[in-house]
Amino acid sequence: MRWDIFCQIVDNYGDAGVCWRLARALSRLSSSSVNNVECDDSRIRLFCDDLNVLNVIAHGDAVGHGASLGIEVLPWSAAESPVILGSVGDVVIEAFACHLPKPYIEAMAQKTSKKAFAKPPIWINLEYLTAEAWADDMHLMPSPQNNGLSKYFYFPGFTPKTGGVLLGDWDEVSSGRFNSGGFKSAPPSLSLILESCRPRSKKISVFHYKQAPLDAWLDSVNQAALAHGEMVDVFLCADQNVSEATQTAFSLANSAVKLIQLPFIPQEDYDYLLSVCDINLVRGEDSFVRAQWAGKPFIWDIYPQSDLAHEVKLNAFLERYFEASSAELRSTGLAAMKWGSASNWWPHLNAWTSHSEVWRQKLMSLGHLEGKILDFVKSQEISR
């Protein structure tokens, strides 16, 4: 079975991150059995309109590294080549309504007309992750097209009626491969940096949008840590930075916070970092989901929209995320997620960590996205 995944970069590394992780997850299922889900003899192609962005999160070489994983990474324009048009996917995933090239859509429609008994491609529109209630009803809804094909809307989510979230190789993280023996098992991109952290320091990873009030937030972290006699090593991921004034303040001897710059690192290395930090500040969909699999407290710097739709999306998630927590943690966590002072949530970090692990187990019980999407494809194959 051939899987074709189409990705256009909108949210910088968020869209690319999800598509690259999905391709890796499907490739992994094709070569092994994970949670009793198998994807036999699959061939995976990933079409992307900006391979430079993909390279950043794929060991600097998406094409080469993809090939080592059984993934053929191609530029968007390749989808209109005669070779590709003559072998369109059995399953076609357009990520985040990216609109497939017209010649490719025409080739999809012609696939059944040229060969007797040929099955049409299973066409899936992979939507953005949401916790809003309407996703339960919209998930897997078909949308008949005027060329005779149907497109199915696939909604990732946090309920049994939605499509789950991507797991990838996180079961290896949670099984202890990354966490045994201190930092001895850290990937090369992180080993020296982690070994240089101060003993018993709390660790925070930061991957944020430029609009975030990061300087003020870090100042509150510093004040909270000082009040509790603790030290904090803060990893500024992906070459992000803070103001010169903040850098100067945290370079003083009486500062609890130490800033550590990190370049872009591969996805699996970032997963490792999240797993060893005490709290993670994340932004786009991919890092947002990985923080949840880490089973650690996190703050979601959701991308702001002019119509304030992001507030609806954030509140819908927080309602589900803190649903089973104590009233005190819920109140504290809600404020923390909206950039509240660290002095308010710092005393509750242990309780928040325990809650985060419970939430991670809930996600696992719902089933992961790659397994659910494969189940859907198999059901379509049987019914056709």
Q: What residue spans do the PLM features occupy?
A:
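Structural motif
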Residues: 2, 90-91, 122, 203, ...
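Short, glycine-rich nucleotide/cofactor-binding loops
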Residues: 5-16, 207-212, 279
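Active-site and donor-binding regions of nucleotide-sugar-utilizing enzymes
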Residues: 6-148
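A donor-sugar binding/catalytic signature common to diverse glycosyltransferases
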Residues: 8, 20-23, 264-313
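A nucleotide-sugar donor-handling region in carbohydrate enzymes
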Residues: 125-214
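Catalytic donor nucleotide-activated moiety binding site of glycosyltransferases and closely related
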Residues: 227-263
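Nucleotide-sugar donor-binding patch of glycosyltransferase catalytic domains
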Residues: 297-340
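C-terminal amphipathic helix plus adjacent low-complexity
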Residues: 323-384
